[in-house]
Every structure is written in structure tokens, then in C-alpha cells.
Amino acid sequence: MSVVAAGTPVPDFVLRREDYRRFTQDDLRGKTSVLVFYPHAFSPVCTDQLNLYEEVLDRFAEQGATLYGVSCDSVWAQRAFKEKLGITIEQLSDFEPKGAACRAFGVYHEKGFPQRALVMVDPDGVVQWSYEAPSPADLPGANLIFDALAAR
Amino acid sequence: MGGLGSAPLPPLGPEDHLLGADEDEPLIVYADYECPHCAVLHARLVRDGGSWAFRHFPVRSKHPRAWAAACAAEAAALQGAFRQMHMALYADRARLEDPHLWERARALGLDVERFDADRRSDAVLARVRRDFESGVRAGVVTTPTVFERGAMRPSAPDEM
């Protein structure tokens, strides 16, 4: 299984927002979105990754990009993680049925968590760029996302 | 403003802060003053007589006082005391609130009023941001990150 490729329409999926409302492919329409799939809330690398992206969030906004964090943690765990870090990046939960959205995007790791991966979706719902880290311990730099935004 | 796409590591320039021994090819270290791993690296570089250039990489959600500390170091630099402030900041990472910064400035004999105005100035903020953004563009993701002869050396503390 590998991450959904550029040029393909985003798959149908259902994630849960922090208030448990549904978040689907329709919520990606009309703007450029970057889904940041990360393995585990509170783990060290995921912490560094979200902290780094948060630091340059205004620069992503200038480029018209909205970031979302996606993991298989529960809504409550994601909320606690977000609060602990003091970040504003919206979190989306793939908790039940576990990993269904991650599987649809081709990023579900056999050990039960999302691969560390980035998926950029254009305003029409087409995957514009995707990236899968060589291992869950590798943290993709923010520069890679800016490169993809510049290549639009 | 443009994005922060990939760009080569900027070579050493006159604005870089060189620390330690005078060597031809110092390390380039991206770090912040609140980061415990950075403090370990700093202590080891000092102990081993290393030669390095220090560049700021503050990430506020990780280390809430890192930006303030970086700006304090740059404000001290405007009075010729970067190195002294740098050492004083790493000497006590637990005391980085404003009164602690003023106290350091006083102890170093700086003009505290000027120091306080400078550390909040757009110019100093831009100076810190320039380091940070150069790191982002060169692929720095966490602190400390060390470049040796232009190549990134990801450094877990145990490996330093």
C-alpha cells in the first residue's frame, strides 16, 4: 500500500472533527488542503512535526493552504494533544472504523497507525501532490510542502 | 511574502555569530535557548573546544520563550555582547522570563533600556526570522540541527 498519487481524485472518506462532526471529501472543496497523516498523538516526532508546521502556519495561509492533522487517535486524545502543544492546526480522527480513511488514502501502516505522509488536495478535490516519509521516524520538512505549493 | 521552499544552506556570512575556536570550517548549528538537547550540544561544544556558528531556530509551541531569548541575544549583539548573552542564556535555561533577561543585560553591563527596546524591535525580529527561515528552507525540522561542511548531521543527543 502506498500513498494516493497526484492526479487522482481524493477518495471518499469520513473523519471526525474535534467536535465529532463528520469531515469528508466535500469539506476539501474550494481550497487547497494539506492532510498531515501522523502516527501517534504525543509521540516525539509527531510533536516536532506539528510544532514546526504550526510555526509557519501563517506562511502556509499566505499560500492559500489549510493544514489538517490526521491520525487514528480518538477525538479526545487529539484534542488533548493539540491543547498540550498549544497549536491551532485542526485535528481529524480516523478512530472508528479504525484507519478506514487512512486505508483509502493508502497510508495505513500494518501495525495499526498512519504512515507519516502528506497529501495536498486542490480546490477541485484532486490530489495535487503526495509524499510518504521513508519511515515513521522521518519528519518531512515544511520546505517540501512549500515546494509543492509553489509548483501548482 | 513568498513561501519557504527548499533552498541551499546559506554559507557563513558576516552576520553569522561565530563561537568557539577560530577554524576554517566551523559547524553551523540551528538551535534555540530553551531546548534541553541544544543545551547539551552547547555544553559539549564548549567543553571540546569546538568551532561553530549559531543560528536561531525558535519554535514557539515547543519552547514558548525561545523567540524572546533569541531576540535577547540579538539585542545584546547590537551592543557587542552576543557571545556573552548566548553563554548567559544557556547557563540557566529555566530563567528566561523578561526580568531574567533584564537581569542578564544588567550583569553584562549593557544599556538595559536600549536592550529592552531593541529586543522588541522589528529589526531584531527580522534578524531571528531570517535564521529560522533559512533553516526551514534547508530542511531543518528540529533542534539542534548541525551542518558540517554544508551537510546536515541529524543529531540525537546521545550521538553528539
Where are these regions (language model features)?
Chain B
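Detector for methionine-enriched segments
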Residues: 1, 85-87, 152, 160
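N-proximal helix/coil linker or "cap" segments that precede and/or mark the start of modular domains
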Residues: 1-9
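Sparse, context-dependent recognition of short Cys/His-centered cofactor- or disulfide-binding micro-motifs
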Residues: 4, 20-23, 57, 70, ...
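A short beta-strand-turn-helix
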Residues: 8-25
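Homeobox/homeodomain signature
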Residues: 8-9, 80, 86, 118, ...
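Short clusters of hydrophobic/aromatic residues that line enzyme substrate/ligand-binding pockets
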Residues: 18-19, 96, 153
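C-terminal cap of thioredoxin/glutaredoxin-like
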Residues: 24-31, 37, 42-47, 103-160
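Structural alpha/beta surface segment adjacent to cysteine/selenocysteine redox centers
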Residues: 25-106
